[in-house]
């Protein structure tokens, strides 16, 4: 892959861990001769013609961001993603694969597969988690909002 323009790496301003990850990726990019820049996600701008820019109004041609697509879709600039000319590394369609709602579908079509756990859609999320079950929200990061009931309760 040939990258002739700056490659931006973005993370949330207050996430030290994500900044460390993007700094490492920037270092790798620089080692292979790709000019790279860091930008905080909160500092990415959008021009009137739908172009993503940095704080100096420079176009962001390539972007790797450590921020979930499902959050971006609901942010003010989320609607600009489909029409913009920024190349995202981790394309927006990956949000489908990161959605835990795909797990029951995989189980339905591949029941008993050794790499899958039995998964079902929760028809009553307000109800307590039964013994021996785990409840995961459709969108979850780093184990957040997971409910677990051991077999013993």
Predicted feature locations:
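Domain-scale recognition of functional cores that engage charged ligands
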Residues: 1-153
């Amino acid at each position: 892959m040939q990258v002739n323009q700056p490659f931006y790496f973005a993370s949330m301003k207050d996430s030290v861990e994500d900044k460390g990850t993007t700094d490492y990726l920037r270092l790798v990019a620089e080692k292979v001769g790709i000019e790279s820049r860091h930008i905080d996600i909160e500092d990415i701008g959008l021009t009137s013609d739908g172009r993503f820019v940095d704080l100096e109004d420079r176009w962001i041609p390539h972007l790797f961001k450590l921020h979930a697509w499902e959050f971006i879709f609901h942010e003010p600039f989320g609607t600009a993603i489909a029409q913009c000319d920024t190349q995202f590394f981790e394309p927006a369609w990956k949000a489908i694969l990161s959605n835990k709602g795909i797990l029951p579908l995989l189980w339905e079509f591949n029941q008993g597969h050794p790499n899958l756990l039995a998964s079902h859609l929760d028809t009553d999320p307000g109800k307590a988690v039964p013994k021996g079950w785990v409840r995961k929200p459709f969108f979850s990061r780093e184990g957040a909002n997971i409910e677990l009931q051991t077999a013993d309760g």
